[in-house]
Amino acid sequence: MSTQALFPVKKLTATGTSEKIYIIPPHRNRYLSEISESIRKYNKETIDQADIAQRLYALHLAKVEASKAKDEVLTAALDRLYASLEEKLSIENKKVIQGWQDKVNRYKDEFYIFKVRDKELKIATHTKSLSNLSIPKISMPKYKGWGDILQWSLQENVPGEFPYTAGVYPFKRENEDPTRMFAGEGSPERTNKRFHYVSLGLPAKRLSTAFDSVTLYGEDPDHRPDIYGKIGNAGVSICCLDDMKKLYSGFDLCEPNCSVSMTINGPAPMLVTFFMNAAIDQQCEKYIHENGLEKDVQKKIDELYNGKIRPQYIPYESNELPEGNSGLGLMLLGVTGDQVLPKDVYDKIKAETIAKVRGTVQADILKEDQAQNTCIFSTDFALKLMGDVQEYFIQNKIRNFYSVSISGYHIAEAGANPISQLAFTLSNGFTFLEYYVSRGMKIDDFAPNFSFFFSNGVDPEYSVIGRVARRIWAKAVKNLYGGNERSQMLKYHIQTSGRSLHAQEIDFNDIRTTLQALYAIYDNCNSLHTNAYDEAITTPTEESVRRAMAIQMIINHELGLAKNQNPNQGSFIIEELTDLVEEAILLEFDKLTERGGVLGAMETMYQRGKIQEESMHYEMLKHTGEYPIIGVNTFLNSKGSPTVIPGEVIRATDDEKQQQIETLNALHSIYSEAQKTSLQNLKLASLQNRNLFYELMEAGKVCSLGQISNALYEVGGQYRRNM
């Protein structure tokens, strides 16, 4: 059944002339409790059906023995009892039991063959150990009883099959680790150099970008005292399209082995426009070279600039491009492809490019209100912008770029325990789902563009955080929302816990990170960032980042058990923890429903209050020593394990800050008239309640981040926290 059939969209208007836009329609306020009820119903039916299947198995064995004994009376009685009971077992569950042995045999075969998006993949099912043993990549249970088989199939199942408890894909990628390292500092050129350093020699380029607080709050670099000191600190400074071109120069953003993650929320739609336009102009540049148009294009650029200085890439601490940087993306600095190529050519390149680019933008405004605080627009308007981006993605067939990364990491870093992190994150995800459905989008058009982001600490619940998230999402999307298999698959990124890193005995931090990475890899996370040991005291160095990358590489390539891809399955404690955490999440869903759902709870700051309480609980236990932390409150060294003071704190230089301001000034001097027109069109689109992302894609070519933010403040309102 379609989502629209389940939840008909009602057009609701307020009295007066303006239309009232509801984020969650009033008739859908119980959506979280409906999810809880649906999952509990599924779990109860699973137990009941498994019990019937087990009794049928017992009768089957009894029939075999009666037949051997040639007791016709007993056999007839057992046949009648069996037939009566069999009627209570659903047809789907009969098929599960009947197909069990074939499934087991498929994993015993030398190769496992399956399809992903119509592409057939052939994967070897075993690896050889140094002792020449054949180690299965997927280890199957040796169940005989039909009830055990059914219970396991309906609640666990193999990776790649509903409810995806063990993973959303049948096997991991053979030639690529799930490594995605986080970087961002100073100018775009400095961060570009770091990106090329961490990805040099790797088969896949998976870049994760941290932005400075000026960018995070949608502002432009400026000499203003409250802005100048923050330019390029704790993240990269990005204020316009040219910055984005420099940031990812040398990486072909359309290559299937390249993907980009951007940790940006309030101004996320603007950064996505910069990214998309940078990718489009890269492909325009390739077209220019392939067709020998360099001289013609250069002539057009010279006419446009008419003697003025063009933006340029200024290599960081060098006179040359970083190793591995081919210069791709730098030819059209200061201009866009549509200024130098015919419209039909540009439009074709644009359509092909945005359909190919791979990546993720965080864009989760709900967790910003609840935990991280980089909200810039009013919540309703920010959600409208998110919906506009997703609607644009649907209409332009953008399937490989995730429009939102629904994030629990910041909730955990603010102090939430793993259960609250997961409950708030999933509830936020279902809130986005409900809002998009209320706008008329079909779940199968947008749910595959969702991704999730969790923290991994050392608490026991973290060992099952992915299992529970995948299971809850799949059950709800399939049984309540009617989503297809791709919509049911929850894909997530893990970053090891920054909060668990301590400024005392910092060398011990690598041990903590290793254990957290082991949790994540055993739980089949889709990508992983391992924190550097010195992040507790400074921005990581190249040496510490290399060590952090080595942690997950050693697990993936040297640790023998990691060759198996479902090592958690079959563990009594893992299975019990999964059930316990699942029910704890559903209870939290019910508490949120009592407070009016996620948005209603936010109005009374329920989530923030709970996070603060849990943070205080942890800090008190740490302070008293009841919660032991090695090298911090116990097992101190002879000097008392004092806080480590860094020899140098990495900061953006004054030259980098001035460079960013000059880039901005050059943009304004060249495009001042075009900026006025673009910003006016953007505001008009908002007042007419049209999709803003179409206008943002144009404004992003000539306007700065701060200009766009200020234009949207005028029509959408600035963020104000409820008190």
How would you describe each model-predicted region?
Residues 101, 105-456, 461-462, 480, ...:
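Catalytic alpha/beta active-site cores
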Residues 287-290, 349, 396-404, 436-449, ...:
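Flexible, glycine/charged-enriched surface loops at secondary-structure junctions
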Residues 526, 558, 562, 584-678, ...:
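Intrinsic disorder at enzyme termini
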Residues 2-149:
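Extended helical scaffolds that flank P-loop GTPase cores
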Residues 197-198, 210, 241-251, 274-282, ...:
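Generic, well-ordered alpha-helical scaffold segments in large soluble proteins
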Residues 399, 440-446, 483-496, 504-536, ...:
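Flexible glycine/proline-rich, aromatic-decorated loop/lid segments
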Residues 48-94, 98, 288-306, 442-452, ...:
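N-terminal leader/propeptide and maturation segments of large enzyme subunits in energy/redox metabolism
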Residues 370-375, 411-417, 454-461, 495-506, ...:
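Short beta-alpha connecting loops at secondary-structure transitions
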